[in-house]
Amino acid sequence: MFPDFRALPWLKIKPLALFTLCAAAVLSAGLMATQTGAPGLHRLLAPVYAAQDAPRTLSPISFDYPEDGSIFPPGITPPMFIWRDAAGTSWSIDITFADKGAPIHAVTRGERMHIGASDPDTVADSNSPPKLTLQQAASWTWTPDARTWAAIQADSVDQPATVVITGYRDGGGAFSRSQIRMTTSRDPVSAPIFYRDVPLMPSAGVNGVVSPLAPTAIHLIHWRLRDITKPESHTVLKDMPTCANCHSFSADGKTFGMDIDGPANDKGLYALVPVQKHMTIQGKDMVHWNPAGDIGKTRVGFMSQVSPDGRYVLSTFAGPSLKLLESYYVTNFMDYRFLQVFFPTRGVLAWYDRSTGVRTPLPGADDPKYVQTDGVWSPDGKYIVFARAEARDPRPPGQGKATHALDANETQIQYDLYRVPFNDGKGGVAEPIAGASHNGMSNNFPKISPDGRWLVFVQCKNGQLMRPDSQLYIVPAEGGTPRRMRANTRLMNSWHSWSPNGRWLVFSSKARSPYTQMYLTHIDADGNDSPAILIDNATAANRAVNIPEFVNIPADGIDDIQVHVADEPAVAAALPKAANGTN
């Protein structure tokens, strides 16, 4: 039991303390979490614990989550506290507050980490069931109930709570201890997160050609909306007959855009619809990027972004003369953990005007000597930040075939971030952003804070986005000294998005599992960020989260999205074409 009375320094224990200790030992058979102001249990036990701990030097506990300095958003669901303590068999958890709130005391025998439920439909020979790492398998956990967590949050607003875990051995006293400090922010997340929920099921087809997902499994891709104050997400779109990919919303949350594959594997369809509780995408809502006669031949839209006011769409276009394999490096692997490398090697930025139906290259980002991609709007719509590199063949002659992510046989490309005026579509001179360019690394996927002050981007050795070595950096939007963000995890940090109030960033990572999860970090007015906070239970344990994006709508602002664009050539012929301007 907890603790062994024979090991106690009896001369220092008063009878009342001994009685209280016996009560605590009985309660520790389960989990007890109380605010101890009224019963006084923690106060009465304090001299007992002090007496036990005094004669010995306590071994350190590895406190894995949350990390010291973590900042939680108000109202988020209770987190799982995770630690490693090889010799402990029971633990006390003591939480004290800088605002003098009533301390919280819990005792527990701990629970081992476990894998959540899997989706049986996404189990395949090409992937493996999620499993704990050796470190995770050695971990112990404690999750406060909703009432206890609410009390912790209420007393830690903008002032750190100190969490102390003390370990005990069966038959002995206190053996180990560690502590962290954590805070609850006053800044709400203020918006739900829209994200793509995908199976990781690479498939080998005819002649051994590998696809990230077999055509027969496309319908397993889901889109979800998550309110972080709720324990589960809500599926808003599923059972798509064709693949749909990158999505974006206008800053006001009124317009939604998404790349959708059309008939004959046409990669040039784009949906633009108003955001409503019940949304429907039909043929009339589709823009066809491809010129007439090129359906199914050319991929001309990539990383499309709706403007802040919803009037324009910015995208990467390779031009009508270049086919997919002439403008993109694409390699797929049977390794489900990192199953694809995909990045453009040629292309220009062009903008589409919804009011005129005209697509026009943007001067300053339309030089065919370069690949210009990943374009994003400033919050006021006055300038564009984008990634640029010298254009090249996706597969130079004699190049070997890459067999895994970060293989030296990948086509090498390092992007630099540039800024160019939009100037009502007239563009201007593109200038490199200091701190995010010409540093020997690949700088990509920029996202500008809603107040226009900060730029968060991905940095990796080669290519962009879903790289094992992807790290998040922050730099002043006009350029300056970059900082590696504290929120970075050990493996793949990417697909980030700012909350509408500019105080939170959501991003994806494979830190805990090859099945990608999403995390939050708080960013203050000076651009300082906090350790990563897991958004738990975003999907099944054997499915991956990508492209999480905050949407400036109420938490229940989208209930469902219906897609009624039939996979038929006749429908494609009826779709509106985006007229070329100077292109």
Labelled PLM ranges:
Residues 17-28:
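Bacterial N-terminal signal peptides
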